[in-house]
Amino acid sequence: MGMSFGVQAAETIKVGIMHSLSGTMAISETPLKDVALMTIDEINAKGGVLGKKLEPVVVDPASNWPLFAEKARQLLSQDKVAVVFGCWTSVSRKSVLPVFEELNGLLFYPVQYEGEEMSPNVFYTGAAPNQQAIPAVEYLMSEDGGAAKRFFLLGTDYVYPRTTNKILRAFLHSKGVEDKDIEEVYTPFGHSDYQTIVAN
C-alpha cells in the first residue's frame, strides 16, 4: 500500500489521529491522542521518517459512532493523511472500516478486539479473545486460579463484549460448564452503578 504522489511530494507526512476527545469515550481515548502526539514529537526530534517530519492532524469524533466515519473520510479525502491512528470501541472501528476500504486508507487500531474480522486496511494491534479472554478463563478454571465453576460475564452493551462473551460461552460449554452456571449482563455506555449488579 503506497502513499499517493501528493503525500510523497509534500514536505511533511500527515498522520491522522482520530480519538474521542469529548463524550463518553474521552476518558479512554484522550491519552491515546496524547501518546500519539508525544511519539510524533520524538520521531521528528530524531529527523522524522525518510527525512520528512510527521505532521499530526487531530480530529475529535466525540464518542459519536457515525461521526467516526465522517472524520475518517475527512482525514483521508480532505486532509490527505498517509495513515490514521484511531478508534477505541469496536463499533467505532466497524463504522470507519468501509471508509478505509473504499479509499484504501490505513488504520492502526490500538486496543483488543473481538476478532472475527480481517481487513488489509487495518493493523489490529490488540489481542483477540483467544489471546486474552480465553487464557484468563482457563486460569480461573485451574486450581491455581481458584477452580471457578460459575461465571458472570459483564460488559457494556455493544459489539466487543457481546461477541467476546459469545466466544467465552462456547469455550465454557466445551469445558462442560452449563448455561445455568453462566450469567451475562450488559450495561449502557456511561453506566456507573455496578454495586447493584454485583450484589445480585
Question: What residue ranges belong to the model's regions?
Answer:
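Glycine/serine-rich loop-strand microenvironments at binding/catalytic pocket rims
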Residues: 9-27, 100-101, 106-110, 114-124, ...
